[in-house]
Regions:
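Flanking helices and flexible, charged tails adjoining ferredoxin-like Fe-S electron-transfer domains
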Residues: 1-6, 32-75, 93-171
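Residues that cap or initiate secondary-structure elements
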Residues: 15-17, 133
Length: 171
């Protein structure tokens, strides 16, 4: 268990237009070193993003992993394939058996079990904050800036500074 709370990507539904650019950017960021540009004509595998945009007539909002410190998905995994590494909950895709226990345990609906192709086993996919990359692809690509990385420690510092700055002068 980590002492520092995990950061996670948060969405502002009022800004999201449902364009799904975040889904494509996520897929691209996790396409294991593909160098050529990905277009409709050259993608051979299913697009499996680790963020999902829910859209209806009234709103659209991306849903992604909240990087829970005491993660229900990790606690439910019978083989411990979901672990915390450097304050990020990650799936060991080589160990995952595709049992879907994590899917049922996630209160946010942010984990999914799929296969890249019919000849490959089904495994769990979830946001890993683009682990090993400089920035989160979904945050970087969002045209309306509806997504941002939420760091609980930085947010607490920001709110503390705001509170001190807004103290009455007689204090």
């Amino acid at each position: 268990m980590s002492i520092k709370p995990n950061s996670f990507v948060i969405a502002e539904a009022s800004k999201c237009v449902g364009c799904k650019a975040c889904e494509i950017a996520c897929f691209r960021a996790h396409s294991n070193g593909v160098k050529k540009p990905l277009t409709v004509g050259n993608i051979k595998t299913p697009i499996i993003p680790r963020i999902h945009v829910i859209k209806n007539e009234k709103f659209s909002v991306p849903v992604q992993c909240r990087q829970c410190e005491d993660a229900p998905c990790a606690n439910a995994c019978p083989i411990e394939a979901i672990k915390q590494e450097d304050n990020v909950m990650v799936v060991n895709e080589k160990a995952c058996i595709g049992c879907k226990a994590c899917v049922m345990a996630c209160p946010f609906g942010a984990i999914e079990v799929r296969s890249e192709s019919e000849d490959k086993p089904k495994i769990a996919y979830k946001c890993d904050l683009c682990k090993g990359q400089e920035t989160q692809a979904c945050v970087k690509i969002c045209p309306k800036k509806a997504l941002r990385l939420f760091d609980p420690i930085e947010e607490k510092k920001r709110r503390s500074i705001e509170a001190v700055c807004n103290l009455p002068e007689e204090f």
